[in-house]
Amino acid sequence: MVHPIVSTPRLDAAMVRIRPVALALPGVVERPSHGSPTFFTAEGPKGRTFASVHDEREWHEGRLCLWAACPKEVQEALVSGGPERFFVPPYVGHRGWIGLRLDLPSVDWDEVCGIIEDAHTFVVDR
């Protein structure tokens, strides 16, 4: 199934902040996956997904969010410690990924950048 590429004003605004951070990491490439901007550890079949950004207006709870790879214990700590900001995302949550809301009135962009960097390190080191 071909998924249409999602582009909304709020997604585009978030990508202005997220894209430079992710693409500055070693070997990272961006390409759409299931219609959403997605970051991979490398080009081609060896590239593994470590983060993606979703505007869920059409599905789930209407969130604008970052999904990022992390160890299961980190997922559990973040979700239990900040359920208003963090959640277990569909499809990938069972593998330890976290969802971080980007549509709240106050977003800590330094934290977002750190989560992206940690996700990259986690996937590369596996």
Model-identified regions with their sequence ranges:
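Charge-dense, helix-prone N-terminal extensions
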Residues: 1-126
